[in-house]
From Swiss-Prot:
SUPFAM superfamilies: Concanavalin A-like lectins/glucanases. InterPro entries: BGBP_N, BGBP_N_sf, ConA-like_dom_sf, GH16, GH16_GRP_C, Glycosyl_Hydrlase_16. Residues 1-25 form the signal peptide. Changing A292V: In strain: Netherlands line N02 and Netherlands line N30. Glycans are attached at N362, N373. The keyword Glycoprotein applies. This is Gram-negative bacteria-binding protein 3. Residues 162-490 form the GH16 domain. The keyword Glycoprotein applies. Residues 26-126 form the CBM39 domain. Changing P213L: In strain: Netherlands line N02, Netherlands line N07, Netherlands line N17 and Netherlands line N30. Pfam families: CBM39 (PF15886), Glyco_hydro_16 (PF00722). The gene is GNBP3. Transmembrane segments: none annotated.
Length: 490
């Protein structure tokens, strides 16, 4: 039995290794090192499309211990003259000296390393080369960086808490994922768009599609997510059938991909929207920043989520958690801002870890008229929500584990499973990014006045009957724009 368990564990480790290797499809270019006389050296790689950061970490005549920061620890955030270049103008190197180093590149929003680098000084480069230079002792003067606004300096690197794709990050405070959406379409190396009907646990009144510019497009450096009607998008009424085809991202030959409105009490969903998620990027602990402009339409939920990579604590009903960085709801003439650590799908447990920032009507807090920065700081002990740099919500395990959460006398059905994790479980596993729009549904609006009843067999039709009266105005207010997303290690 023990041998069998060891074999299973070994097989799982091997599969994980293959998965990680499959993700690392990009190889960091070999660093070019030039040493100058009487002092200074450069480390560089060639520029290429997709690189947004190059980092160098090194020590002189002393091997690096793993991914330590080293004597030199610098991020270069802009290429010059076709190369990403780290420059030291102070240190004097002599023949026989050895530079030990590792480099790091963010390519297409993902981080890659070249580890265990070493370089032995055999001579000098450039016009200052000298065949017989005098022996110059290594400077012990602390290194002082040049005043270069294009260089982001991080000396005294601290051990990070963040993990990315199952591996520890190199240093706290580093940019590990970024997309500023400046291309003509979503980067397929970073994102995967959904194409499926909605389902449990919220059964939204929409289908997600991946090929409709009316619901998802990139323009002026923004992702624009919009709502559309089934009638406009597919020229189909409620009582007709719709097959999303081989590109469906749900389970084939199920209600994820095919529905016949004639056989359903509620017919086809009346709305079409979009949703996309990070393809090969997931992380545990970090700082997520999203600059976005929210929709104002009633019963449209903007999705700026973190979703679990693996259902460690349960598959259904958000038992493995969902982190909502930000979403909004109309409230009279104002727009309320919410954040949430969702532990279960049904009330009263669903909203027990919600945070609310009531709308004030002030221009500075009109979440739909202008862009705002929505931030989540996720550490092993707490979750902090910020908007425009100001903290407005904290949820943590200092006063008790999340597994102990109760509401109206009810406990979490997965509480015993959560006790196997940390106090912050289920938020002690890797999560991935999700952006999108959903419309209506069950659970999402349980406490709000709405034209449909929870679990009613014809809830979608009741929703559409109400919205149809104000369709054009409602659609005009059903947009969300995202300027950028950035993830930093902590």
């Amino acid at each position: 039995m023990a041998d069998a368990l060891r074999f299973v564990a070994w097989s799982c480790c091997l599969q994980l290794l293959f998965l990680l290797l499959g993700v690392q499809g990009y190889e960091v270019p070999k660093a070019k090192i030039d040493v100058f006389y009487p002092k200074g050296f450069e480390v560089s790689i060639p520029d290429e499309e997709g690189i947004t950061l190059f980092a160098f970490h090194g020590k002189l005549n002393e091997e690096m211990e793993g991914l330590e920061a080293g004597t030199w620890a610098r991020d270069i955030v802009k290429a010059k003259n076709g190369r990403w270049t780290f420059r030291d103008r102070i240190t004097a190197l002599k023949p026989g000296d050895t530079l030990y180093y590792w480099t790091y590149v963010i390519y297409n929003g993902l981080g890659y390393r070249e580890d265990d680098g070493s370089f032995v000084v055999n001579g000098y480069s450039g016009n200052n080369a000298s065949p017989h230079p005098p022996v110059v002792p290594v400077s012990t003067t602390p290194w002082t960086p040049p005043a270069d606004p294009d260089i982001d300096i991080r000396l005294g690197c601290t051990t990070p808490k963040t993990e990315v794709n199952g591996a520890p990050t190199r240093c706290a405070g580093q940019l590990v994922f970024v997309d500023e959406f400046n291309a003509a379409k979503l980067d397929p190396n970073k994102w995967k768009a959904e194409r499926r009907f909605s389902g449990q646990p919220d059964y939204e009144f929409n289908v997600y599609v991946d090929d409709a510019p009316e619901t998802l497009c990139l323009a002026n450096g923004h992702v624009v997510l919009s709502t559309n009607t089934m009638k406009k998008q597919f020229k189909k009424g409620s009582g007709e059938s719709l097959d999303l085809g081989e590109k469906c991202t749900g389970q084939a030959n199920t209600h994820d991909c095919v529905r016949n409105g004639r056989t359903l009490n509620d017919g086809l969903p009346p709305m079409v929207t979009a949703q996309f998620s990070s393809k090969d990027f997931s992380f545990k602990y970090g700082r997520v920043e999203v600059r976005a402009k929210m929709p104002r339409a009633q019963w449209v939920t903007p999705q700026i989520w973190l979703q679990p990579r693996r259902p460690i604590y349960g598959v259904d009903d958000y038992r493995s958690g969902q982190l909502r960085i930000a979403y909004t709801r109309p409230n009279g003439g104002n727009l309320d801002l919410y954040g949430a650590a969702v532990l279960f799908a049904d009330e009263p447990l669903r909203s027990v870890k919600n945070c609310l920032k009531p709308g004030t009507g002030n221009n500075s807090e009109d979440w739909s008229d202008s862009f705002h920065n929505y931030t989540l700081e996720w550490t092993p002990r707490e979750l902090r929500w910020l908007v425009d740099g100001k903290e407005w919500c904290v949820q943590g395990s200092a006063k008790g584990s999340f597994s102990e959460t109760t509401a109206a006398g009810k406990s979490l059905p997965q509480a015993q499973k959560l006790e196997e994790g940390t106090g912050l479980a289920p938020f002690d596993q890797e999560f991935y990014l999700t952006f999108g729009l959903s419309v209506g549904g069950f659970n999402e609006y349980q406490h709000e006045i709405k034209p449909w009843n929870e679990r009613a067999p014809q809830a979608q039709k009741a929703f559409w009957k109400e919205v149809k009266k104000i369709r054009d105005h409602w659609l005009d207010e059903g947009h969300m724009k995202i300027d950028y997303v950035k993830v930093y290690s902590l």
